[in-house]
């Protein structure tokens, strides 16, 4: 089947429900980014950015009704079919900063977890091997073309050369939790020998510049002096 090419793609009303666990979600996406989801516990619409909610609105009851229908259908299919549970896939995680890292400047770490199936996962942040909960936000499960899912977890932080970070991923498809490590890359300080060589090169280049400049000045003066003698009439 050929892929459909389009400038923009909206995925409206993605409804997921699975059992056991009574886990579900209702989301809207635009160009692969989450637009909003319906909080099933609070029964309210949660916008990815508050500004989105100022431009339009969505009645959370629509999402809750979809979840109820999917739950009902799943229960019927489970009772009437000799089903085989789907295989668990091993998710893949990558950690990277949102912006170029400058020590002491606020930034955001992003943990991108792909190939999630089924859509049940724990993503936690560790700083110096200790759990971090402040400044953490994660998206809902976003659908891939192959019907697996991906999810992003964000951690706001201030880079320091004393801190190291890990994104911890736990999933049924993993034999053990996976840790994706990240720490700021600090340029190594120059050694005394390197500093001496750099200074010597700089001094040499400066001396060469002075000599070359002096030569040009002398040649210019000679050329100017010659041009002042009048030729024969």
UniProtKB/Swiss-Prot annotation:
Annotated source species: Mus musculus
Cytoplasmic side stretches: 222-233
Family statement: Belongs to the MHC class II family.
Topology in the lipid bilayer: Single-pass type I membrane protein
UniProt keyword Membrane present: yes
Chain positions carrying an annotated carbohydrate: 122
Alphabetized PANTHER family for the sequence: HLA CLASS II HISTOCOMPATIBILITY ANTIGEN, DQ ALPHA 1 CHAIN, MHC CLASS II-RELATED
UniProt-annotated stretches for the region Alpha-1: 1-88
The protein's name in its UniProt record: H-2 class II histocompatibility antigen, A-R alpha chain
Renumbered residue ranges of the record's region Alpha-2: 89-182
A GO cellular component entry from the record: MHC class II protein complex
Keyword Glycoprotein in record: yes
Localization (cell): Membrane
Disulfide bonds: 111-167
Region of interest (Connecting peptide), ranges: 183-195
